[in-house]
Regions:
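Extracytoplasmic/lumenal domain signature
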Residues: 2-3, 7-40, 44-125, 129-402
Length: 402
């Protein structure tokens, strides 16, 4: 089972960026610390308030585990093979850690000594906990495997989404993953819904004009364990960033490069509806169990919310005065967090953590991120209601309820 905190980037395996933990509307910046390198994925938070960051550093440690409730005190750190910053660490409910590096998936116990390491073809995206202690690992070169999370042994069949991949060249196209270009077949982490057993991901096949969506089905206890169910080119301009699955596993939400938000049937990949955003969202939307969708972030975006009404989307509110740089992280029914441009006060520059009401878009609070540079890599919400954000330039900011 995943950790009770914020187990990995975008929260749960469905990439919903939602937690039932009631969010705090008042926050205090408790500590800030640098990873002494860069970050390309958000930090993960464990059930014990531990924080894991997968940094890219010029030397020394790169994978770090800190104590979020003790001023970021380091528990342990180690160095991974570099080049895999796009993969967020994943905590399970026993504080074991899973993280990808080019050519391997690695698991650590609550201490820094490796539990197991297994070779893969490519760079694993953020791994996903399935059922029965099984771990889904999808690499940027399109290899899909399931591992026993305790032993590290492979379970069932693998699925190769790309043909004729050279297994020895496991870093090929890796530089295209961050900007989501054609050289990286699987540039973003998959979404998994336990309710339906569906796994959905974006795939840019070699020679194809755009990235399409692919649906796989997970069959626990059966053979084959994984089957490829469908390929959808409904988003004709191509998909961008990780897809998100609804809580019941029936609908997949994804950004289109056509400045639209798309909803598709998870069972067959056929479109339900699309709605214009009037901007290109570079990070995934956030989705609540009640069907509220908050658009993703990126440069020149706006904060917009929609309600899934079945065969169409209804705009609930739009904030043209707010430009979110990150995916919004939603906590309970009434609180959302996003890193936005500027800050409190007229003419403010830099970045701030915005606290808002997802129901109506109203701003509740805003907290400046001191000396923040680069771009934000996401917002993580702990089960103790602490909120952590970080920047691509490696600065981590931890807030506590005030």
């Amino acid at each position: 089972m995943p950790a009770e905190g914020w187990p990995a980037q975008y929260g749960d395996a469905a990439n919903s960026s939602y937690t039932p933990t009631p969010g705090a509307t008042g926050l205090t910046l408790r500590w800030t610390r640098s990873v002494k390198g860069s970050l390309a994925a958000s930090v993960a938070l464990s059930s014990r308030n531990w924080l894991a960051a997968n940094a890219q550093t010029p030397g020394g440690c790169s994978l770090m585990e800190w104590e979020n409730d003790d001023n970021g005190r380091q528990r342990w750190c180690t160095r991974l093979f570099q080049g895999g910053g796009i993969s967020s660490p994943l905590f399970d409910g026993f504080d074991n850690l899973y993280v990808g590096q080019p050519g391997a998936i690695v698991s650590f116990p609550p201490t820094q000594w490796i539990r197991w390491r297994r070779p893969v073809i490519g760079m694993p995206s953020t791994p996903r906990i399935l059922a029965h202690g099984q771990l889904l690992v999808v690499t940027h070169l399109g290899q899909v495997q399931v591992f026993d999370s305790h032993r590290g042994t492979t379970v069932g069949n693998s699925v190769d989404l790309v043909d004729n991949v050279d297994p020895s060249d496991f870093t090929r196209g890796l530089s295209d993953c961050g900007p989501a270009r054609s050289g990286c077949p699987v540039a973003a982490a998959p979404a998994f819904a336990a309710a339906s057993g569906m796994v959905v991901l974006g795939l840019w096949e070699p020679g194809a004009p755009v990235a399409v969506l692919v649906g796989l089905k997970y069959h626990p206890g059966q053979s084959p364990l994984l089957t490829r169910e469908w390929t959808s080119s409904a988003v004709s301009a191509g998909v961008l960033a990780s897809p998100v699955l609804s809580s019941d596993g029936s609908t997949v939400y994804v950004n289109g490069r056509d400045e639209r938000l798309w909803a598709l049937h998870a069972a067959d990949g056929k479109p339900k509806w699309s709605v214009p955003l009037k901007f290109v969202a570079q990070t995934p939307p956030s989705v609540t169990p009640g069907g509220l969708i908050v658009s993703g972030g990126g440069p020149d975006t706006r904060l917009v919310a929609f309600k899934d009404a079945g065969d169409h989307a209804e705009q609930v509110w739009r904030r043209n005065d707010v430009s979110p740089l990150s995916t919004s992280s939603l906590a309970g029914r009434g609180v959302g967090y996003a890193v936005v441009t500027g800050g409190p006060g007229a003419g403010a520059r830099g970045m701030s953590l915005l606290v808002f009401d997802p129901g109506n878009g109203r701003s509740i609070n805003s907290y400046r991120l001191p000396e923040a540079t680069g771009y934000p890599v996401g917002v993580s919400i702990g089960h103790d209601r602490r909120v952590v954000t970080a920047t691509s330039d490696g600065q981590v900011y931890s807030f506590a309820p005030s």
